[in-house]
Amino acid sequence: MAEQKKYLLFLATPDSEFAKKTYGGYHNVFVSLLGDEGEQWDSFRVVDGEFPEEKDLEKYEGFVISGSSHDAFQDTDWILKLCDIIKKLDDMNKKVLGICFGHQLIARAKGGKVARARKGPELCLGNITIVKEAVMPENYFGEEVPANLRIIKCHQDEVLELPENAKLLAYSSMYEVEMYSIKDNFLCIQGHPEYNRDILFDIIDRVLAGGHIKQNFAETSKATMEKNEADRKFWQKICKNFLKRQPSLLV
């Protein structure tokens, strides 16, 4: 009998009331996107200082770092500790998928530069352009590489400079770095492949209620999803292929 494959999710955000009520928390949101039958998915709420033992990292096939309301360039203890773990996972040649904050933190840990987004925050359905020559059609993207992909965006920071040896995989009219990879170890995505319309709208409503955005910004953000949806199935394929297959993403 094949040994059960294990994956670890670093949760860098608390569960919203909506996420808990609707999905049982963000753990389940991620597993619904990335998980397969027979796998074990463990979560550690790193934003609350909950981390796995270093000796236990070896037993996991792959790792996911979630989004967060915190800035990846902050020097709080849990963020610095997560940076150290990223470096250890790199040394171990482990697969690490970085989402939003995770995308930014991996860039920081690997020597890149992260800062407040120069063109302002995004809370919307965005369209990103794939750098076709940077990916091989027969690998994680499948037989055909699309020119563009839609993805839900929810962030106020950005990667300004890629780490050495990083490969740019996607960009947009708003941001120069929407997706990148480093060797076969890291795949990093600024958007949220795990989000859907309901999750985005709940975030917009909460941010609006907190006074962080204005009503017209909230309405414009929601309007981006009136006629279109995120390419969730395609993102699911990319992320699962990265975490669970061996071929290189790089040309």
From Swiss-Prot:
Coiled coil: none annotated. It holds the Pfam family GATase. It is found in: Cytoplasm, Cytosol. Gene3D superfamilies: 3.40.50.880. The keyword Cytoplasm applies. Pathway: Secondary metabolite biosynthesis. One of its GO terms (cellular component) is cytosol. Disulfide bonds: none annotated. Its EC number is 3.4.19.-. The active site is at C100 (nucleophile), H192, E194. Residues 16-213 form the Glutamine amidotransferase type-1 domain. One of its GO terms (molecular function) is peptidase activity. Keywords: Cytoplasm, Hydrolase, Protease. One of its GO terms (biological process) is proteolysis. Involved in glucosinolate biosynthesis. Hydrolyzes the gamma-glutamyl peptide bond of several glutathione (GSH) conjugates to produce Cys-Gly conjugates related to glucosinolates. The gamma-Glu-Cys-Gly-GSH conjugates are the sulfur-donating molecule in glucosinolate biosynthesis. Belongs to the peptidase C26 family. This is Gamma-glutamyl peptidase 4. The gene is GGP4.
